[in-house]
UniProtKB/Swiss-Prot annotation:
Gene name, Swiss-Prot/TrEMBL: tuf
GO MF: GTP binding; GTPase activity; translation elongation factor activity
EC number of the protein: 3.6.5.3
Protein name from the UniProt record: Elongation factor Tu
Subunit text: Monomer.
EC class: hydrolase
Region called G5, residue ranges: 174-176
Location of region: G1: 19-26
Residue span(s) of domain tr-type G: 10-204
Binding site for GTP: 19-26, 81-85, 136-139
Annotated positions binding Mg(2+): 26
Organism: Prochlorococcus marinus (strain NATL1A)
C-alpha cells in the first residue's frame, strides 16, 4: 500500500513518554500506535521496533531515541521514547526532542520510583509545560485501594515539584493488555489520548513570537551597506522595521532595509527562513557572529545564569578528568563561543559536591565575560578547545 500523503490540517504537538525504567514506557508507546492504527490514525509499531531505536548525535552527544507519529481526531503528534535512563537525561537537557508535554508512565505495581522523581524534576527544569499520568500495569493490581494510594502519592509528588498535582489527569491503563487487543484496555488508551488532547496545551507557534535571529555571518556590500545572515529562530521581520542588535557589546538600534533569501528580495522573513538582512547605518565591524537581531525591546542581554548540565563521559568525547568550581570553559550559545566561568555547582538533587566528574549531572551557576542574549529554557554547550564537554539548559537568569 502506498504511503498516504501526510495532511497538515491539524495542529502539531510534540510529546514523549517519561518515567522509571521498566514501568512500561515503550510498551505504552506501542499500545498507543496499535489502538490508533485501528482507526487509521497511526501505523502500528511493536515493542521491538520502538526499543531498537537508532543512535542519534545531537551536539556531539550520542542519544538513543525512538520517534513515532500518530494522530487523534484533533491533533497530529510526534512522540519520542528513549530506551535508557541516561538517554532521557541527555535528550531533555540538549533539547534534541523538545516536548510540549509528556506522558508520565508510573507502574501501579511499584508506584513512584527514583527515576520517576528525576524525570518530573527534569521536566520542570527544562520547561516541559504539561504532564498527563498513565498509571500502567493496572491489570496486575486487584486491589482498587492500592491503585488509589499510588495515584494520591503521584499527585502529591507532582505538587511538590510545582506541577498542578490535583488537576493533572491520571488514567489507569495496561499497555500490554491493550496490545493484546482486550477491548476494555483499548478503551483506556483512547481515554489517555483524550486526556492528552485536553490537558497538553497547543504550543505557541514560533512565528507568533517576537522576532529573533542569531547572527551567523556578516558581509559588507559596497554601496548598499552591511548584511547579517542567519536563520530566523522565531517571529518575522519586515522591510522598514526597527530591530535591536543585542549581545557582546552595547545594544544598538537599526532599521532593516532589505530581506534577502536565495538571492531574491523579500518583503519579510519568517521563522525557519535562512536570510540576509540589510541593516541601515551599521558598519561591518559593529556586528559579529554571536549577536542576535531582535524585535525592539523584546530581550535583554545577561551574563549570569543557572543551568542544568550533563557533563560528557570520556567515551563520549568529554573530559578525562574532573573539574572544580572556578573552571573557565567556553559556553557555546546559539552561534558562538563565549568564555565564562562555572562559579558554583551542586549535584542535580541539590547536594554539595566538591568536583564534577565526566558523566555527572549538575546544577551550576555560570558567569560570562560578555553579556549575551540568554533566555530561560535555552540550550547551550560547554566546550573546551573546540570540543563539546557538556550540554546544558538555562534554568534561571540571575543578572
Amino acid at each position: 500500500m502506498a504511503r498516504e500523503k501526510f495532511e497538515r490540517n491539524k495542529p502539531h504537538v510534540n510529546i514523549g513518554t517519561i518515567g522509571h525504567v521498566d514501568h512500561g514506557k515503550t510498551t505504552l508507546t506501542a499500545a498507543i500506535t496499535k489502538v490508533l492504527a485501528k482507526k487509521g490514525q497511526a501505523e502500528a509499531q511493536d515493542y521491538a521496533e520502538i526499543d531498537g531505536a537508532p543512535e542519534e548525535r545531537e551536539r556531539g552527544i550520542t542519544i538513543n531515541t525512538a520517534h513515532v507519529e500518530y494522530e487523534t481526531d484533533g491533533r497530529h503528534y510526534a512522540h519520542v521514547d528513549c530506551p535508557g535512563h541516561a538517554d532521557y537525561v541527555k535528550n531533555m537537557i540538549t533539547g534534541a526532542a523538545q516536548m510540549d508535554g509528556a506522558i508520565l508512565v508510573v507502574a501501579a505495581t511499584d508506584g513512584a520510583m527514583a527515576q520517576t522523581k528525576e524525570h518530573i524534576l527534569l521536566a520542570k527544569q527544562v520547561g516541559v509545560p504539561a504532564l498527563v499520568v498513565a498509571l500502567n500495569k493496572c491489570d496486575m493490581v486487584d486491589d482498587e485501594e492500592m491503585i488509589e494510594l499510588v495515584e494520591m502519592e503521584i499527585r502529591e509528588l507532582l505538587t511538590s515539584y510545582d506541577f498542578p498535582g490535583d488537576d493533572i489527569p491520571v488514567v489507569q491503563v495496561s499497555g500490554l493488555k491493550a496490545i493484546e487487543g482486550e477491548a476494555d484496555w483499548e478503551t483506556k488508551i483512547d481515554d489517555l489520548m483524550t486526556a492528552v488532547d485536553a490537558s497538553i496545551p497547543e504550543p505557541e507557534r514560533e512565528i507568533d513570537k517576537p522576532f529573533l535571529m542569531a547572527v551567523e555571518d556578516v558581509f559588507s556590500i559596497t554601496g548598499r551597506g552591511t548584511v547579517a545572515t542567519g536563520r530566523i529562530e522565531r517571529g518575522k521581520v519586515t522591510v522598514g522595521e526597527e530591530v535591536e542588535i543585542v549581545g557582546i557589546r552595547d545594544t544598538r538600534l537599526t532599521t532593516v532595509t532589505g530581506v534577502e533569501m536565495f538571492r531574491k528580495l523579500l518583503d519579510e522573513g519568517m521563522a525557519g527562513d535562512n536570510v540576509g538582512l540589510l541593516l541601515r547605518g551599521i558598519q561591518k565591524e559593529d556586528i559579529e557572529r554571536g549577536m542576535v537581531l531582535v524585535k525592539k525591546g523584546s530581550i535583554t542581554p545577561h551574563t549570569k545564569f543557572e543551568g542544568e548540565v550533563y557533563v560528557l563521559k570520556k567515551e563520549e568525547g568529554g573530559r578525562h578528568t574532573p573539574f572544580f568550581a572556578g573552571y573557565r570553559p567556553q559556553f557555546y550559545i546559539r552561534t558562538t563561543d563565549v568564555t565564562g566561568q562555572i562559579t558554583a555547582f551542586t549535584s542535580d538533587d541539590g547536594s554539595n559536591v566538591e568536583m564534577v566528574m565526566p558523566g555527572d549531572r549538575i546544577k551550576m551557576t555560570g558567569e560570562l565575560i560578555a553579556p549575551v542574549a540568554i533566555e530561560q529554557g535555552m540550550r547551550f554547550a560547554i566546550r573546551e578547545g573546540g570540543r563539546t564537554i557538556g550540554a546544558g539548559v538555562v534554568s534561571k537568569i540571575i543578572e
